[in-house]
Amino acid sequence: IWGLSGVKNIELGVVAEGERAKRLKEKGCTINHTVYHPHVWTPQEAYGVDLLVVSLKYGALPGALESIREAVGENTIVMSLMDGVDSEEMISTVIPKANIMYSLIKVASHKEEDGYCFDPETTIGIIFGELEAPYESERVRAIEELFADTGIHFRHTDYIREEMWSK
């Protein structure tokens, strides 16, 4: 949300239901002392988004799989920026593996009274890539284009599996 909130010509939102959706609609989310109010969509409203970033506590993933399935369209790219190395495998039980862009995030964040904080300059950022050639795929280029000029640190790699295992 932090880096993408200023990107023109995109519709940025989060998928949430129940109390979480209500809280996000009313209070937004605070990152680095700035309150963001992204769109809040149900999985059905989000259906077919170009990019779905899964960013949950690991224990919440099993309960979110149905929502992920409902949001992913034929051409949706799914990036799972969660701890652990098997979230993509879990997600691929409900969507085609071809929709998944293997990825990880390296960020040192901490909770403060009003939200979460991190130092954008010292953050390694998002690392992503295709499991198999072609590694410079259209999907990789689309993500690079989206993240360019956002302040988000990112890079793609031909060795995403090894990067994930070494995190």
Predicted regions located by residue number:
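NAD(P)+-binding Rossmann beta1-loop-alpha1 motif at the extreme N-terminus of oxidoreductases
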Residues: I1-H37
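Residues at the C-termini of beta-strands that transition into short coil/loop
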Residues: A16-G18, T42-Q44, M82, L104, ...
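Internal alpha-helical scaffold of NAD(P)-dependent oxidoreductase catalytic cores
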Residues: W41, E70-A71, V94-N99, D114-S166
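Short, charged/polar "capping" segments at the starts of alpha-helices
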Residues: R20-K25, E88-E89, E136
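A structural signal for isolated positions on well-ordered beta-strands in alpha/beta enzyme cores
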Residues: E11-G13, M79, M101, I127, ...
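Rossmann-like NAD(P)(H) cofactor-binding subdomain of soluble oxidoreductases
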Residues: H33-C117
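Flavin (primarily FAD) cofactor-binding/catalytic cores of flavoenzymes
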Residues: V14-A16, I68, R139
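A short, glycine/Asx- and small/polar-enriched loop/turn
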Residues: D50, S166-K167
